[in-house]
A protein has these predicted regions:
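Hydrophobic membrane-insertion alpha-helices, especially the h-region
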Residues: 4-19
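Membrane-interface motif at the C-terminal end of an N-terminal transmembrane signal
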Residues: 16-29
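Export/targeting segments at the very N-terminus of extracytoplasmic proteins
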Residues: 31-96, 120
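Second-shell loop/turn segments in exported
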Residues: 47-56, 72-75, 97-105, 139-150, ...
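Alpha-helix N-cap and coil->helix boundary residues
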Residues: 60, 79-84, 170-173, 196-200
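Short, functionally critical alpha-helical segments immediately adjacent to catalytic or ligand/cofactor-binding
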Residues: 77-96, 110-111, 154-157, 174-179, ...
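Conserved alpha-helical segments that form or flank metal/cofactor-binding pockets of metalloenzymes
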Residues: 92-123
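Alpha-helical segment that forms one wall of the substrate-binding/catalytic cleft
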Residues: 113, 117-187, 200-201, 206-210
């Protein structure tokens, strides 16, 4: 099967960015970049070694990670870094597909159902035949569907694509938007918000990326 690019445009104002807190309000995906900055910052971070159990769980997800990160997003046919998605999964859930936070975020990358519903509408509009995804889920999405590893990873790639486009591939700002929301990033003039949880997540994710970047996961 030849994988074609998903080309989507993005028209977004700063006001819309601030209103984005609860999910997609306007626009759609830009190209998902694998920025040199991400790799440079990863190399300078202390590598954080996952546990053996984490690595075993992550290994079972490889077909989904490799497939969804092989899809090209946007007019530049850019692709998401597989190591970024692996690191996001390790950071958010320790690769537990049925993880759930006290705030209701679910699945491997801890996605809020409200945000997922908006993304699902965007994905449904593409009429794209994704592998590993039952097309009926686009018509009748339920919060528990976020426990499906393939769907969770697809949504994570789509969301991350938008953030990478907005923040020119800055790992720190992409993670800040993921954790605290784009509105928080905007309130602090496109700087990392001074939230301990957000800054801790950035450190952990970059640590996992540094470990993965050493070629420790095939």
């Amino acid at each position: 099967m030849k994988i074609r690019a998903i080309s989507l445009g993005l028209a977004l104002t700063m006001a819309a960015l601030v209103r984005f807190e609860a999910g997609f309000e306007t626009g759609s995906v830009w190209g998902l970049l694998t920025p040199a900055e991400a790799h440079a910052s990863s190399e300078s971070a202390w590598a954080q070694r996952p546990s053996g159990d984490q690595l075993r769980r992550l290994a079972h997800l490889e077909p989904y990670i490799r497939y969804f990160t092989s899809l090209a997003y946007g007019p530049e046919d850019a692709r998401v870094s597989a190591d970024y998605i692996r690191a996001l999964i390790l950071t958010e859930s320790s690769a537990h597909a049925h993880a759930r936070s006290g705030k209701g975020a679910r699945g491997l990358t801890q996605i809020i159902p409200g945000t997922a519903r908006i993304v699902m509408k965007k994905l449904a509009a593409l009429s794209y035949d994704f592998l590993y995804i039952d097309e009926d889920v686009f018509k009748s999405f339920k919060p528990e569907d976020l426990y499906d590893p393939a769907l969770n990873i697809l949504i994570a790639c789509y969301l991350s694509a938008t953030y990478h486009g907005w923040y020119d591939g800055s790992t720190e700002l992409v993670v800040s938007a993921w954790n605290a929301g784009p509105g928080a990033v905007a309130r602090y003039d496109n700087e990392v918000p001074p939230y301990p949880e957000t800054r801790g997540m950035i450190t952990r994710l970059k640590g996992f990326m540094a470990y993965l970047g050493e070629g420790n996961v095939n």
